[in-house]
Amino acid sequence: MNDQQEIPTVQGLVRTEPIQQRSAQRIEMLLDAAAEIIHVSGIDSLTTSDVATRSGSSVGVVYRYFPNIQSLLRALAARNLEHYTDRVFAALENDQHAWRNALDAAIDTFVDMYRNHVGFRALRFGDVINDRFLDPTLSNNGVFARAIAGILGEKYGFAPTDDLVFELEVIVEIEDALMKRAFLLEPHGDERFIEKAREIARSYLRDSANLPDVS
C-alpha cells in the first residue's frame, strides 16, 4: 500500500496544532458541541456561534482552531473515522477467526455508530457533503478502505497491498450503498439490507478477491 497516503486525523486538520492537553480537550469540546448540534438539527443548521455557545467557548476560540464550518466538519468526520477504526480494532482484539471474516466486525461497528454515535448519521465520514471530503486526492470510500486495510494488516500481521486496498474499496462501495438504503426509511436500520451487506462481504472476500493468503 502506498505509504504516502495517510489517513486524515483531527490533529492534522486543525488550524493550530494542540500542544497542551488543555488545547486538545478544548478541540474535543468543540467537536462534541458540533456533533450534538447536527445530531438534532442537521448539518445545514451548524454555525460557528452555535458551536461556541454550546461548548461554552467564545467564537474566537472556535476560529483559533477552525477557520470555517467546513474545516470543523472535516475534523469531525476525521474523528468519526478515528472512533470507527479504534472500535473495529478493539472488537477484533480477541477474535480468533480468519481475517476474511473480520468485515463482520467492521459492518457491526458501522451499524452501531449509525444507531448510537451522536452526529454520525448526519455526517458519517463526510461523504454526505462531498465524495472527497477527507482527502482531495481520494474518494471518501478510498480513505475508508485504506483505514480498514490498516486495521486488518495490523491485527493479522501482513502488509496491505494495493490489490487488497482496491478489493476492499470495491466492497466498501457495495456496502455503502446497502447501508444508505438500510437507514433511509428505518431509523434503526432495515435488518434485511444489513444482513445482505454481511453476506456479500463474506462471499466477495471468500470467492472473488485477489487477497493475501493468511489465516
Question: Where are the regions a protein language model picked out?
Answer:
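N-terminal intrinsically disordered/low-complexity leader segments
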Residues: 1-25, 209-215
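Generic hydrophobic, amphipathic alpha-helix propensity
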Residues: 23-34, 51, 76-84
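Helix-turn-helix
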Residues: 29, 37-71
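Amphipathic alpha-helical linker/stalk segments
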Residues: 79-102
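Amphipathic alpha-helical packing segments from all-alpha helical-bundle domains
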Residues: 86, 101-116, 132-157, 165-169, ...
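Short linear capping/connector segments at secondary-structure termini
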Residues: 90-94, 123-132
